[in-house]
Amino acid sequence: MKSYLKALVFAVLFLFILGFVYPTVTSLITEHALPFQSEGQPVEIDGHIYGSYLLAEAFNSSFFFHPRPSAIDYNLSESGSYDYSLGNPAMLNLTEKYLHRFLSENPGVNISEIPYAMISYSGSGLDPGIPLQGAIIQIPRISIAIHNITNLSVSDLYSYLYNLVNSTKTQNFPFFGSYYVNVVRLNVDIVEFLLKGGYISQSQI
């Protein structure tokens, strides 16, 4: 009887420690040490929350950097993708569809310049990261689009965007990894640039 009681006490104790104390303590430490990360890295512009730097959205405007294709149309409630193999005809058809869409959105880009990630969906369907090259080849289209609403020099806009992209690049693995950029972060910088210049209003975001 005593052994059963001892086992029950230990079970309740461990349940309390591992189910309540440990999660609570780690949560409090994280909230104070890394408040931005612990809150999901929210996108805040002029006091309003518009999303998260961790989640891609369907940035359809021509003056935005476009993310990777999404099998779920960037639906936050349905994270995931198709389970097609690379040789599956359906996968090949989707890749061809994404390729034609990218080329139509970015005239002048050569097929050989397009990273495969830009014409294939991510595993979650919400990945905000794209290859550095995938961002750079979008700059001409974005420069012209911003010029059309600001009348600023296309060459100056290209330089601004090129520097912006390269200043935010990160490696997916230290030292030897490929360079990626976060499209949400880039697009937030564009929005803030346009807001600051008075080219768009808060209601247009």
Swiss-Prot record:
Recorded family membership: Belongs to the KdpC family.
Keyword 4Fe-4S: no
Membrane-crossing residue ranges in chain numbering: 9-29
Annotated Pfam families: KdpC
Subunit structure: The system is composed of three essential subunits: KdpA, KdpB and KdpC.
Gene (UniProt): kdpC
Main location: membrane
Originating organism: Thermoplasma acidophilum (strain ATCC 25905 / DSM 1728 / JCM 9062 / NBRC 15155 / AMRC-C165)
Protein name: Potassium-transporting ATPase KdpC subunit
NCBIfam families, A to Z: PRK00315.1 (NF001454)
Cellular component GO terms held in the UniProt record: plasma membrane
Alphabetical list of PANTHER family matching this protein: POTASSIUM-TRANSPORTING ATPASE C CHAIN (PTHR30042), POTASSIUM-TRANSPORTING ATPASE KDPC SUBUNIT (PTHR30042:SF2)
Keywords from the UniProt entry: ATP-binding, Cell membrane, Ion transport, Membrane, Nucleotide-binding, Potassium, Potassium transport, Transmembrane, Transmembrane helix, Transport
One Gene Ontology MF term: P-type potassium transmembrane transporter activity
Function: Part of the high-affinity ATP-driven potassium transport (or Kdp) system, which catalyzes the hydrolysis of ATP coupled with the electrogenic transport of potassium into the cytoplasm. This subunit acts as a catalytic chaperone that increases the ATP-binding affinity of the ATP-hydrolyzing subunit KdpB by the formation of a transient KdpB/KdpC/ATP ternary complex.
Compartmental location: Cell membrane
Membrane-related topology note: Single-pass membrane protein
